[in-house]
Structure formats: structure tokens, C-alpha cells
Amino acid sequence: MLGSICIVLVETTHPGNIGAAARALVNMGLSDLRLVRPQAFPSPDATARAASGEALLSAARVFSSLDDAIADCGLIVGSTARTRSVSWPVMSPSEMAPVVLDASHQQRAAILFGRESRGLTNRQLDRCQLFVTAPVDMNHASLNLASAVLLLAYELRKSALLRDGSAASDRPTMGKDLLATSGMVEGFVAHFERVLHAAGFLEQPSDKLFRKIRRIFTRRALEEDEVNILRGVLSAIEKRIDGAANNR
């Protein structure tokens, strides 16, 4: 279970926080740390803060884009402390943990943490199906990045231990309703956008409108079969549009 969950730190500015996060993950039995455009990594500061997590830190993978970092993951969870204009499910860490563990039986699950100064951007949160917020004192709502990682990792481990007495790092099982990876979903979303342009629906580009359209399909984790069906529908529409254009 825990071995199928990855922690993704996006655009971390202080390398010491990366090392401290690695230490927190080792303490809680997680082993997959991914970094998206860190400001400084590798770094002596990160190594110094990692302590027992130095091996995990050395194995951390660095990505140039968030989409690449989560391409092999099914459920994507965004950590956030801010209220935004688009409605979506927001869970506490204890509510989030069993949902992530369930999803990790089918595909890898990812939990995203944004830059220390601003958190995840709206576009980065658009990649998520659910969101987690720690119930901290609103007068002192800012958590250190490594503390936030430790808090969520602790809830994951606690939930795994309560579930079956073991937090074993087993690989995902291949269930009959396999979740689509983020890469598959993003491929579908790009296909859908092309069809909307071809149909004339998006003649006037609107990021706000397309973000709302995107949420229709990403507010929950889609299954592979569902994505394949939707791609088939889009391909059929494309053929009809192309045929109509050729007959003009």
C-alpha cells in the first residue's frame, strides 16, 4: 500500500525542506519522493536535513513538469490551505488517508505539495481529483512544508496499520476496474479540447471556461475503460466533423 503512494514536491525553494521531507517519509514507511523543478537539488542542505532519509533522498526523481511527475499515477491529491472559486471535495488528513490507500491498490497515488510561499497554483490543482487541508488554527495556519508532509504521511501509515495491521509496501494490484493514470486523463483532456475547437465551441479561448469543463471529467478518478470509451466518442465526432468539412 504505502509503497504505491508517491509524494510530489512542486517547485520547492528551500533544499533543506526537501531533506526534512525525505526524513519524514522514511519515518512513516513511504519510499517514493518526486521533485518538480526544485530551486536547488542536489544540495548539501537537503542531505544534512535528511538524516536517516538520505538513501530515499538520493533516489528521489526530478521532473521538468508536473504532468511528467504524475503521468503513471491514478488518484492525484492536492494539499492546499486556500479556498478557491471552483467547488471540489476537500478532506481532512484522516479522511484522505483511507481513500488514497484504496486507490493505491489499483494504480499509484500521488499527493502534491506546492511551493513554500504560495502552495499549489490553480493550474496545478486542476490535475487533482480531491484535496486535503489540515484543520490547523486559522490564526496560525501556515505549516512548514516538511511538517505538512509528515502530518499526511502519518495519517497514511496510521490508516494502513488500522486496516490490516500492516503497512507493507506492496505494489498495486491489477483490479478489473483499473484507474486511468494521469497521463491517460491528460491525453483525453487534450483530445477533448481539440474537438471543441474543431466544432467551433471554443472559438474564443477562455481559460476559466475550460477549467470548469476539465473539472467535469477530473472531479473523480476515471477508470481506464471510461477514458477509452470517451476517446472513442471523440474520435467518432472528429470523423463526422472532418467529413462535413470535406463535403462543403
Predicted features, each with a name:
Residues 1-248:
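Post-transcriptional modification and biogenesis factors for structured RNAs
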